[in-house]
Every structure is written in structure tokens, then in C-alpha cells.
């Protein structure tokens, strides 16, 4: 009796294991190296299951993994990861400047008026290598011109400072070059006339998904946000980070910081505000200019980024508008923060990441000729810009396109843990 019972137990266990394997075969297996919103999205996505092995189809990797494991990993046909091997060509500030200047020079040689057609980075130099070129440029500007210094790989506002006098850069240069190569920084002419709302400076975060560089295929999400500085704008003091920087990490250090107080606007809200103040025609031009900034910046690195069909990347574009609504590119982030600062922020990032997975179409639900998926609009297909729908900005949120209901309405976000 005992042996029969044991046999039944073994058979039952084998069936459970077999059924478990069958269930896993039907699911899309993922790994995730982070524990923020992307982890929540993947865990809650229907038909997906987490794995600790190498049988994953989707892996949200870290920058460290790309550095240490990418070259060694043997990808299977269906595996996808969230970074391109040398995305730094676009996302490291010194490389961004170098590639922008190279593309600008090529356009100038071909007879294009770069002042009007290719002019979206402020005057910029990489230090210490371009120090003498910077000094030459510095002396052409009025004495009260403000410049801004940024570490090439910095984030969250760390290491940034503003100055008016050359001696401040000379002091930095002396301090950072103690017998070894100085820490690279970029120096840029500060956009002194930013567009202000309620007397405050702001920049905008736009999410751009690149699924291929050759050919160039890129999508832009209609949602995003404007980040406002903590204090009202003034050029009287260049040392007050609460006035000049819009990073949430900086604002959080203020004694009276309140994440729910309204230091962020949604992009649709911002663009509706622009329209109410400046009219549809002006807003349309700004949208065209903004689209051009994204497209041209991607084209400038199209032939430099290592193309790999296993890779995609969600970039965070940081844009500043001046008082004339001209967009200036501040930087491109390879790892835009996915950690939520509020419930509203969580829901926004949850939607964007869910729509990103829809675009990647790992589940094979799409036909293949879609121009809109979730909140994403196709911006460039096979290296050619896509004509976007023209609708009323008063009712529609971003880039003049309609909501796409092909995959249903926005997925409702789960509560923040």
C-alpha cells in the first residue's frame, strides 16, 4: 500500500513539473535587474513570467551588464535587451556635442543654412580638450554672459555650476588636473532667456523609443512632463541651484519641497497652455522644430551606434524652450529614471513602459504597418520621417496625433507599492 502511494505521489509530482514546464512554454519569460516601475509593469503583464535562468526573451539590463556581459552573451533569436552597445555616442554629453558638430559641419558643406536648419545645441565645448577653443569663443561674448559647466556623465544635477568669469573655469581646470587627465566636462552658453511659467524656468522630458538604428526606426510618446525649478527665475545669482536647475533630485533638497505641490505639468497641459497664449500656428511651428531636434539628433549617430536586432532603447530627451518657443536640446538620457516620485508619476511611467512593450510586439499582436501604438507615434520609419496626423491641439495631446485605440485605451496602472 505504501509503495503504491509512493508511486502515485511520484507520478503526481512529475505531472505537476510537466504542467509547469508547459505553462512556462506558453508564457513570455523576462528578467529585470531593477525594482522600480519597469518591474511592476513586467510582473503585472498578462502572459509574462519571471525567470532566473537564461531562457528569457526580454531582459531589462543595467549599464553594468552591458559593459561586462554583452560581448560574452550568445543571444538566441528571440531575446531582447533594453540598451544598444555604444549608446553613449548619443547619451554622453561630450559625444553628443562631438557628433552634433560633425553633423552640422557636413550639412554646412552641403550648402544647408545651419543657423536656421540645424541649430539646437547652445555653443558647446568639451573640457579640457577644447579649452583654448572655448576661451577664444568666451571672449567674443559680452562680460555678463552666463555659461554652464556639466560633467559629461553626470546625472540629477550633480557637479553642475554656472559662471560669468573665466577665472572660475581656470580654478576648476587647476583643481581637476593634478598630474592626471582632468575629469571631462562640457561647457555651454547658458540659455539666458528661458520661457517662464509663473516666473519659473522649466524643461521637458520626452520619451523616444528607438527599435533600430539601421534602418532608423523611432517612436515618440505623447506623454511626458515639464519640470519646474523650485524658485522663481533670476540671473542675479548664478549659484542658486533652486533657480537654475529643474532636476527633481535638486528640488527634493529644498526645505519646503512637496512632491504634490505642482513642480510638474503633463506635456498635453503645457502644449495647451502654449496654444492658449501663442495660438495654433506658433505651436505648430514649435512642434515641427521639436520633431526636427529629435530626428536630427538620432540621424547624427545613426551610423555610429552598433546595430543589433536584439536591442532597443527608451531615451529620455530633455528639452528647454526659450522665450520664443525655440527648443534647445539639453541632453539625452540612456537610463531615464523609472522610479516614481508620486502616484501620478508612477501612473505616467507605467503607461509609457506598457506602451513600449506593445510597440516591441514580443507578443506578436501587431500587423506591422502601424503608425500609432498605445501612446507612441511612429516618428521615423526606415530612416524616413513619418507624416503625422494634423488635428486640433486643444483636444489632442501630443505632436498633433490622435489617440490610438488599436490596443484598447491606456492600461490602468496598479497602485504604487
Swiss-Prot record:
Residues 23-372 form the TTL domain. The keyword ATP-binding applies. PANTHER family: TUBULIN POLYGLUTAMYLASE, TUBULIN POLYGLUTAMYLASE TTLL9-RELATED. Polyglutamylase that forms polyglutamate side chains on tubulin. Acts when complexed with other proteins. Appears to be dispensable for polar spindle formation in dividing embryonic cells, for cilia-dependent osmotic avoidance and for male mating behavior. Probably by regulating microtubule stability via the glutamylation of tubulin, regulates PLM axon developmental growth. The lineage of its organism: Eukaryota, Metazoa, Ecdysozoa, Nematoda, Chromadorea. Expressed in head sensory neurons. The keyword Plastid does not apply. Keywords: ATP-binding, Ligase, Nucleotide-binding. InterPro entries: ATP-grasp (IPR011761), TTL/TTLL_fam (IPR004344). The gene is ttll-9. This is Probable tubulin polyglutamylase ttll-9. ATP binds at residues 188-191, 201, 203. Coiled coil: none annotated. Belongs to the tubulin--tyrosine ligase family. One of its GO terms (molecular function) is ATP binding.
